[in-house]
Amino acid sequence: MLADKVKLSAKEILEKEFKTGVRGYKQEDVDKFLDMVIKDYEAFHQEIEELQQENLQLKKQLEEANKRQPAQSNTTNFDILKRLSNLEKHVFGSKLYD
């Protein structure tokens, strides 16, 4: 999924060779800069992996919570009906059930 969007990998950056001209860039400066870019790529890749794992975990938790919610609602309705029945018995006494 990530490989489709990213054009360069850390390995490709590391192995990239630049031709030198008469008055080209200092190779040492280019190498230092590319090393920083590689470290950033690796850090971003690691962060993306961790976030994708967390995202999957949260989706599973949400799915489980949604599955449990209707069961809790039925239990709550049962409790309300039971309390209502007890209140009716208390208010109207046994006349209601005779």
From Swiss-Prot:
Keywords: Cell cycle, Cell division, Cell shape, Coiled coil, Cytoplasm. It comes from the Bacteria. Residues 34-72 form a coiled coil. It holds the Pfam family DivIVA. GO terms for biological process: cell division; regulation of cell shape. One of its GO terms (cellular component) is cytoplasm. It is found in: Cytoplasm. Gene3D superfamilies: 6.10.250.660. The keyword 4Fe-4S does not apply. Transmembrane segments: none annotated. Its main location: cytoplasm. NCBIfam families: DivI1A_domain (TIGR03544), PRK14127.1 (NF010725). HAMAP family: GpsB (MF_02011). Belongs to the GpsB family. Divisome component that associates with the complex late in its assembly, after the Z-ring is formed, and is dependent on DivIC and PBP2B for its recruitment to the divisome. Together with EzrA, is a key component of the system that regulates PBP1 localization during cell cycle progression. Its main role could be the removal of PBP1 from the cell pole after pole maturation is completed. Also contributes to the recruitment of PBP1 to the division complex. Not essential for septum formation. Forms polymers through the coiled coil domains. Interacts with PBP1, MreC and EzrA. This is Cell cycle protein GpsB. The gene is gpsB.
